[in-house]
């Protein structure tokens, strides 16, 4: 039940499922199907960061996402843990990471994940087109 509650909280709050205000049933179904996949993925990352924080990030997140985030932060890809990856995604979404702040919320995680996802899409496009920066 707790996991199910967390899933719906992620779907509702983080993914803003209610705010989509789709009027046609088919559009709502398609939107919820996509958002549910994202919510499950984010919930898996959260559980990995909480339950097994020292687990290598490449085992719980796509390797490209870890590599892009590491490059963005100017750090080596090796040695990233699930918890470190989770908090860095949250920082992309505006999380400050101070001690009294507690854990990041779903909206912050969702914003950070969307930014990271856009960065990985950009890297993938640049690689397929043979583009280079600098």
Q: Where are the language model's segments positioned?
A:
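Short, surface-exposed loop/turn motifs that are enriched in glycine and acidic residues
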Residues: 1, 21-27
């Amino acid at each position: 039940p707790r996991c199910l509650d967390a899933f719906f909280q992620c779907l509702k709050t983080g993914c803003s499922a209610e705010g989509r205000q789709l009027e046609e049933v088919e559009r709502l179904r398609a939107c919820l199907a996509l958002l549910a996949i994202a919510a499950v993925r984010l919930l898996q990352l959260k559980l990995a960061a909480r339950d097994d924080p020292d687990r290598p990030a490449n085992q719980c997140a796509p390797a490209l996402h870890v590599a892009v985030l590491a490059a963005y932060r100017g750090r080596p890809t090796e040695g990233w843990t699930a918890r470190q990856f989770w908090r860095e995604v949250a920082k992309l979404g505006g999380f400050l990471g101070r001690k009294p702040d507690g854990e990041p919320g779903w909206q912050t995680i969702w914003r950070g994940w969307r930014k990271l996802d856009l960065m990985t899409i950009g890297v993938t496009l640049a690689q397929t087109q043979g583009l280079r920066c600098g």
